[in-house]
Amino acid sequence: LSCSIGAATHTGHARHLVEELIKKFGRDHPINVGNGSVYLEAPHARLVTGIKPKTLGDLEDIVEYCEKEIVHLLSCCHTGQEGDNIDFESKVFHAGMIDHVAMEACDMAQISTYNFPKADPEAPLVEIGIGTIDTHKPVILVIGHNVPPAVEIYEYMKRNGLENDVELCGICCTAIDITRHTQKAKIVGPLSHQLRFVRSGVADVIVVDEQCIRTDILNEAMKVNAVLISTHYKNFQGLPDRTNDPTDEIVNDLVSGKAPGACILNSEKAGEVAVRVAVAIAPKRRKMGIIPEDSQIVETAKKCTQCYSCQRVCPNNLPIPEAMKAAAKGDLKPLANLYERCIGCVRCESEGVCPNNLHPHTLMVGASRIKIREEKFKIRAGRGPIQDVEIRRVGGPIVMGEIPGVVALVGCANWPDWKANALIAEEFAKRNFIVVATGCAAMAMAMYRNEEGLTVYEAFPGAFDAGGVLNVGSCVSNPHISGAAIKIASIFAKRKLNSNYEEIADYVHNRVGAVGISWGAMSQKASSIASGFWRLGIPVIVGPHGSKYRRALLGRKDRDEDWYVYDARTGERVYVGPTPEHLFFPAETKEEAMVMIPKLCMRPSDTTKGRSIKLNHYIDLYRKFYGTMPDDIHLFVRTIADIPVTMKDEVLKILKEKGWKESKVPSPDPTLLPRMIRKRRE
């Protein structure tokens, strides 16, 4: 059900966006996602539907297919339907596959029409962080995932010469997508920054569309006298529909305070109203916020009774009472130190939690005032798809294992610490993995500087190559990551693409060393995105909150019979070890995740050089974080040549203790499909 909801959400988004863009640009507007550098431009659509979209109108057929499949998937959740667990899991995988098809159609549409970067490894660096926002200007904040209203806000500013006089900023995926359209827009941060920025009072007008928006956003906007404009029929927020009212009348009502907000379902009109209202009310509002000063924090903290109710409801179990105790004595540092680990859910401020009705999250943000002002970072604008020439360049090294793997950081902001995303990205970019990112994870990666004062996007190149760090785009850009794996099979291995999912997934699972990480996963969309990777045979690691999905897809490395493949050259069944061991793995700490990444990047097709490189990273990280050698090395060493040269003596000793025997076929042509066997041994 969770995966079907996620797929339905992205498909609904695709339907709404494609229809709006067809209305604005015409059904015959050409699809262009690479300016000549991408000829295999819709790998998911071709693989699943056999459709090669050339115009916006073609995308409607793809979305229609997704809608039909989701209806059937949702019907399977009804009482008295599927009774077999494996068949039910198959439907989960199917939902993920459909999700990637819908997201691909969605992003292709907006790249082709809104002048987003088109497979550009040198996409520009844009500003991110609360500290980048110029509070002396009227500020418009956009929140959500549907970018047309934000684009129309900017276009109205541009037409009226207000580009440099009004600040346009965003939270969540709309923020990423508007910075793909213009470098003048700024990103506040990921989903977890939503409430803290709204409560700061910096935003004069808040414009929301769909997905990942707080249900109490209207109440929070009213607390700081900000105007709320809803632009999507999926998220009215209880506001009256003013779409057909005269623009001047709407502006007058909002500026005078007669109405706290309005629902305007026409993107162009919403853009005009947002800018005009922001310019009119900014001088009067004076950025009224509800974040307390230091002296107020100290006085408020003295009322804390140390009942620990706030800590009990905190998803990250933050030591709020101890921080409040220190704050009561005038030391605000412990409270400020909680800021980066807070996900902004505000459970600690829910009704009935604190007996004295204190607001720990608000106090936390107030104590971090200086830190927040210094949040000024650079993120690379979402580049879109991977170029065909990039795939040709890295296809061989990835399949052979010489590039250790592709690490994809994706998903929501429900993490124990946002820095983990940046630390993981930095670690593996240094180790010559290819690091790609989307959405909130891509934003979090930017909000950390290394010893040289650089973010990962400034420190590493943006090309899809060893040691590269790429921001592919927003949530709907995830199919460009999974699509890269598909393109390796098609472009590098010359496998037939159209309507050939089984063979391509078999190729990816057995040959393409890739792993996804959703460190802050929490939404239904995150689960459907993950299941789309699973169906291609790509493992996914989630953070500690990922266990709340109440499922995992874990392998049993102790059961040798589970780890056999066919050698397509001979038809012989060959033991290849647990490569990869798991498909869906919840990690408790970033260290556990970092050890698991090179392990899950191992594939049966690895050459001895490639396996040696991957084992080197696995053993090195295991020793770095656990202080000892892994206990399962013998399962991944097929021949003496697989052993990293610098660790040979230690590993040979372990192999001897385990009674290891050299594999008869150390490097097979692996497949799980009997039909792929070219010649059977007599």
Positions of predicted regions on the chain:
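Anaerobic metallocofactor- and corrinoid-dependent redox/one-carbon enzyme cores
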Residues: 1-682
